[in-house]
Amino acid sequence: MNILSCSTNILNGFYDISGVEVGQHFYWKIGGFQVHGQVLITSWVVIAILLGSAALAVRKPQTIPTGIQNFFEYVLEFIRDVSKTQIGEEYGPWVPFIGTIFLFIFVSNWSGALLPWKIIQLPHGELAAPTNDINTTVALALLTSVAYFYAGLAKKGLGYFGKYIQPTPILLPINILEDFTKPLSLSFRLFGNILADELVVVVLVSLVPSVVPIPVMFLGLFTSGIQALIFATLAAAYIGESMEGHH
């Protein structure tokens, strides 16, 4: 009963987290729900960039790739290596998921530094990278949780739940709690790093000449790429762990 109560409290915590606000927001009413309009706008822009780039890469495929096709093949090989290292020999079906997560986060993070979001005026709030909003990072983390639950159940069936009493039933509460702390750590790590990076750049631009924050912006681009890699690597590791049952 205590475990059920604890799980309910954690789920309620996720709901509260999704309502965390940093600055002003532009809201849309969809049915009976209130959503962050600027997050949807910037997410659609990122998705459009990814789809447009992919369309250009496969428009005229060549045996010896060049240009954007060569770049995407390099990215695909990189994602395959990450997936194989973390998941194992059964990595194949999960490459599209890990790749989508990585590319969406990577482009979202970089868009915060490279795209002139500020010139677009909204009735309330302002546009920023999608990963600058806790709703986006929590959604990505919960999607990862669904993925590794599905991977474990598809591989082991109901026997997957046996992991909660390994190596001893005494660890049952801790093993259950772990499934809630994983998405929490994923979402807060990504959200905190991207928000902090954008805030630092904004503060420096307001305090010093525009040329001074440029090194910080380059450092932010590097950090943003690393955060995308960390998220994708951990997602693959969690999926591999659920399939193998290793802790």
Curated annotation (Swiss-Prot):
CDD domains cross-referenced by the UniProt entry: ATP-synt_Fo_a_6 (cd00310)
Pfam families: ATP-synt_A (PF00119)
Keyword Transmembrane: yes
Subcellular location, record wording: Plastid, Chloroplast thylakoid membrane
Keywords, in A-Z order: ATP synthesis, CF(0), Chloroplast, Hydrogen ion transport, Ion transport, Membrane, Plastid, Thylakoid, Transmembrane, Transmembrane helix, Transport
Matches recorded under InterPro entries: ATP_syn_F0_a_bact/chloroplast, ATP_synth_F0_asu, ATP_synth_F0_asu_AS, F0_ATP_A_sf
Function field: Key component of the proton channel; it plays a direct role in the translocation of protons across the membrane.
Protein name per the record: ATP synthase subunit a, chloroplastic
Organism, scientific name: Trachelium caeruleum (Blue throatwort)
